Amino acid sequence: MILLKSEHGGKRKEMRQDDLMGPNHFSLRIMYKIIIYTYPVSLYAVKELNLSKTFSISALGILNSNSNRSPAKKQTFFSACVAKSYSSFFISICILDLASHL
């Protein structure tokens, strides 16, 4: 099953379920889908408000992971990406909300 196709470094790269995580990491698969679906919203905030590009780097960071890493290391790496992404995402939403009240 292909999760994502992306242009990366001029080459097309396909991420398959078994490349990304083991079959038992159900919650991680859900978080991966959430990141992909919310990416455009956060990218808008990064562009319009000139915020940090943490979300962009984190959401695509999994593409840079070494395919030889163990599933546990990939899960730790991806969890760190999720944490960084959502802290940046929520900060951008708070700033947008604050700006709407001015």
Swiss-Prot record:
Q: Which domain of life is it from?
A: Eukaryota
Q: What is its main location?
A: membrane
Q: Which residue ranges does UniProt annotate as crossing the membrane?
A: 77-96
- State where the protein is found: Membrane
Q: Which UniProt keywords apply?
A: Membrane, Transmembrane, Transmembrane helix
Q: Name one GO cellular component term.
A: membrane
Q: Does the keyword Transmembrane apply?
A: yes
The annotated topology with respect to the bilayer is: Single-pass membrane protein
Q: What is this protein called?
A: Uncharacterized protein YBL071C
Q: What is the lineage of its organism?
A: Eukaryota, Fungi, Dikarya, Ascomycota, Saccharomycotina
